[in-house]
């Protein structure tokens, strides 16, 4: 019998709906193997604002702002088994979600 291990999964994405759907998919998969799940915990959103001039010549007062939001979620899996790890490896997530797994 394999030792039980704790797994921490960090999800990052620019789209909050995509990251929430991915988190629900992971939780459904893990709960089907019988492991205990804590989360998803929403972590602070990183917001980066870029300010650029609208025109190439004059009108310094005319500017435009763009922002990039980086959403993050944290999922802890407690008392996992080898079946849990296998099911997580088989899971397919959308390409817009970055997954970081720590055992």
Curated annotation (Swiss-Prot):
SMART domains: Ribosomal_S10
Matches recorded under Pfam families: Ribosomal_S10 (PF00338)
Keywords: Ribonucleoprotein, Ribosomal protein
One function term, GO molecular function aspect: structural constituent of ribosome
One GO term describing the cellular component: ribosome
A Gene Ontology BP annotation from the UniProt entry: translation
Cysteine disulfide links: none
Assembly behavior: Part of the 30S ribosomal subunit.
HAMAP family according to UniProt: Ribosomal_uS10
Biological role: Involved in the binding of tRNA to the ribosomes.
Official protein name in the record: Small ribosomal subunit protein uS10
Protein encoded by which gene: rpsJ
């Amino acid at each position: 019998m394999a030792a039980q291990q704790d797994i921490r999964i960090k999800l990052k994405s620019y789209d909050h709906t995509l990251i929430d759907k991915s988190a629900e998919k992971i939780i459904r998969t893990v709960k089907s193997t019988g492991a205990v799940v804590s989360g998803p915990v929403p972590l602070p959103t990183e917001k980066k604002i870029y300010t650029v001039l609208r025109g190439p010549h004059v009108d310094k007062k005319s500017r435009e702002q763009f922002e990039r939001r980086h959403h993050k979620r944290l999922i802890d899996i407690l008392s996992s088994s080898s079946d849990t790890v296998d099911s997580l490896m088989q899971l397919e997530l959308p390409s817009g979600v970055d997954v970081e797994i720590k055992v």
